[in-house]
């Protein structure tokens, strides 16, 4: 066996290991070259377990069911006598089977033994994000950091991951510090840039957030997997200040391009922005229809409820209410099925399905029903994944529904909560003025 760039043993030829190491660098920088380097590693040595595992993880991290099914073929029949490689194969198998929590625990176990396994750290971090588990999003990285040499060339990327975990746990100043330290290590660390951007959004520092993202645009606005999502953050900063023109310009330039309407996670960004504009009664023209069509072309399997909810946003926004109701019906059937997927079934039953029902009620103009469904679970939405900033689209929906339903006292509570967290929020102040 040879050693990877962190000093851990792995099976594979020298050429395969070299390509694998380069692939890991691209993975951490969210660069599309990760796919080519992974394929090169697989081609150099098809028996290289870590290369095959990385390829499977790339499919799983898309959050789309067909990619998860396809991921199985990369590890089918693979075994390893090496404990670390065997744990990776186990985690992949659990994830493909729908036990995302089981995969997370297996990766925790793996990192307890091998805290310098950079693939487990990176993949586990994304899995924590998909599961909405903020504590482990922070803890998984924090536990590993003492085992790393700060002079290691990959160390900065760990700080970027730590920054996002700290931010999701509400430690905004510490998150900004860690994120900026990560950027000092690697100017192209778009995950760290995005994490610092989150801290500005959560603190209500919208002008500062725009200035920061503009100052880092040479890194994030190029070809990388976070270009669309970081553009979305910039649009959200504009939206918080009710600068609808700027938000729509970003939507047209980046979020609604043919390229971005191919992957579920980027389509979710587009729909999330358009729905926020919809709540503010901004005319978005024909922008909903291409997005709704893109979602309609996706596999309908209930695999990740976060995506299902954003599909409903697009269908309701496009006036395709019947299709939105059909998605809710599929979700209801999935929850009742004895074969339901473990993790997604839990997320769907506890929060995802009620939110889906609330969104379709909103589409019907039944704002009382929207509030009655969503209000009891408004603090439980993290279970279906995403960040605080992403899930805020549902909190906004609740607030607008309450206002339209004439529930003045509840709206006052929701507005006060928002203004305490984001004192500079023009949007929250405007909602209060509507009363």
Q: What is each stretch, according to the model?
A:
Residues 236-435:
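Helix-coil-helix junctions within alpha-helical repeat/solenoid scaffolds
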Residues 142-241:
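Internal metal/ion-chelating core segments
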Residues 36-40, 67-79, 101-111, 134-148, ...:
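Alpha-helical repeat scaffolds
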Residues 15, 46-51, 83, 116-120, ...:
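Residue-level recognition of tetratricopeptide repeat
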């Amino acid at each position: 066996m040879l050693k990877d760039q962190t000093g851990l043993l792995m099976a594979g030829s020298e050429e395969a290991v070299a390509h694998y190491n380069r692939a890991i660098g691209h993975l951490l920088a969210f660069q599309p070259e990760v796919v080519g380097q992974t394929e090169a590693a697989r081609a150099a040595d098809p028996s290289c377990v870590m290369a095959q595992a990385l390829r499977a993880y790339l499919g799983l991290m898309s959050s789309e069911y067909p990619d998860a099914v396809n991921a199985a073929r990369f590890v089918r029949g693979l075994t390893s006598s090496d404990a670390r490689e065997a744990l990776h194969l186990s985690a992949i198998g659990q994830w493909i089977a729908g036990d995302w929590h089981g995969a997370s625990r297996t990766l925790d176990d793996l990192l307890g033994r091998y805290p310098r396994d950079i693939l487990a750290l990176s993949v586990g971090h994304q899995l924590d994000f998909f599961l909405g588990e903020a504590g482990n999003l922070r803890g998984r990285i924090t536990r590993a950091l003492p085992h790393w040499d700060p002079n290691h060339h990959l160390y900065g990327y760990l700080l970027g991951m730590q920054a996002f975990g700290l931010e999701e746990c509400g430690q905004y100043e510490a998150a900004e510090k860690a994120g900026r330290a990560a950027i000092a290590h690697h100017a192209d660390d778009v995950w760290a840039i995005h994490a610092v951007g989150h801290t500005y959004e959560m603190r209500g520092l919208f002008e500062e957030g725009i200035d920061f993202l503009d100052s880092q645009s040479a890194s994030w606005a190029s070809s990388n997997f976070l270009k669309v999502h970081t553009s979305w953050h910039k649009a959200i900063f504009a939206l918080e200040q009710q600068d609808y023109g700027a938000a729509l310009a970003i939507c047209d330039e980046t979020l609604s391009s043919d390229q971005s309407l191919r992957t579920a996670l980027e389509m979710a960004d587009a729909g999330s922005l358009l729905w926020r504009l919809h709540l503010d009664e901004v005319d978005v023209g024909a922008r909903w229809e291409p997005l709704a069509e893109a979602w309609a072309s996706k596999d309908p399997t209930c695999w990740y409820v976060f995506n299902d909810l954003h599909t409903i946003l697009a269908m309701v926004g496009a006036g395709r209410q019947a299709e939105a109701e059909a998605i809710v019906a599929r979700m209801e059937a999935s929850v009742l099925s004895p074969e339901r997927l473990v993790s997604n079934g839990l997320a769907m039953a506890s929060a995802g399905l009620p939110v889906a029902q609330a969104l379709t009620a909103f589409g019907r103009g039944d704002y009382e029903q929207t509030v009655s469904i969503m209000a009891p679970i408004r603090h439980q939405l993290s279970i279906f994944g995403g960040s605080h900033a992403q899930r805020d689209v549902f909190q906004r929906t609740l607030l607008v529904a309450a206002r339209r339903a004439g529930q003045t006292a509840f709206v006052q509570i929701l507005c006060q909560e928002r203004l305490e967290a984001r004192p500079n929020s023009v949007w929250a102040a405007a909602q209060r003025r509507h009363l």
